[in-house]
Amino acid sequence: MPRVVLAIAAAPLLMLTLIGCKANPPGKAETAVVNWAKHKMFVHNKKEKNPIQNTPAGIADGREAFSHYCAACHGLDAQSTGVPFADRMSPPVPSLAGMDAQSYSDGQLKWIIDFGIWPSGMPGSKGMLSDDEIWSIVLYLRHLPPAGSLGEPQMYTQ
């Protein structure tokens, strides 16, 4: 009997809580606080340097690795071109050419690729990608092409 009473009493509270959890995009202040926290508190390895040489071959290797491992969510150009769900995720898939992503150091970008960013949709890939693959992707991110210039990922055009 006490469990039934507790369940009946808790049901309206649960309903009110769920109603209050409506998914709204974050405001400017909330976004600024979260971005500050990501850059200063959650993402590490700020001083780690990229050992991959900044050469056309290094950039091409990064583009190749990016097209295999990252393009499904970020598009071939890292700006979500042709990714049908990118703007419907919560939070939306960011443009990696944008100021927020480009303001990370190379070491921080490697850390993000290694460990992901929770609770966003960015998974970690430590153990799946080699350090050289990750560093080459970081190098590619520093040399992104114009939005849409590489077309859409084949997986969405076939």
Locations of the language-model features?
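Sequence/structural segment immediately N-terminal to covalent heme-attachment motifs in c-type
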Residues: 55-81, 86, 109
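Bacterial signal peptide processing site
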Residues: 22-24
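C-terminal motif of bacterial Sec signal peptides marking the signal peptidase cleavage site
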Residues: 17-20
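Electrostatic cytochrome c docking/interface patches
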Residues: 28-65, 157-158
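Flexible coil segments in periplasmic/lumen-exposed cytochrome c-class electron-transfer proteins
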Residues: 26, 44, 67, 103, ...
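Bacterial N-terminal signal peptides that target proteins for export
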Residues: 1-9
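Conserved beta-strand positions that form and line the central face of beta-propeller blades
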Residues: 51, 95, 121-124
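Short Fe-S-cluster ligation motifs
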Residues: 100-114
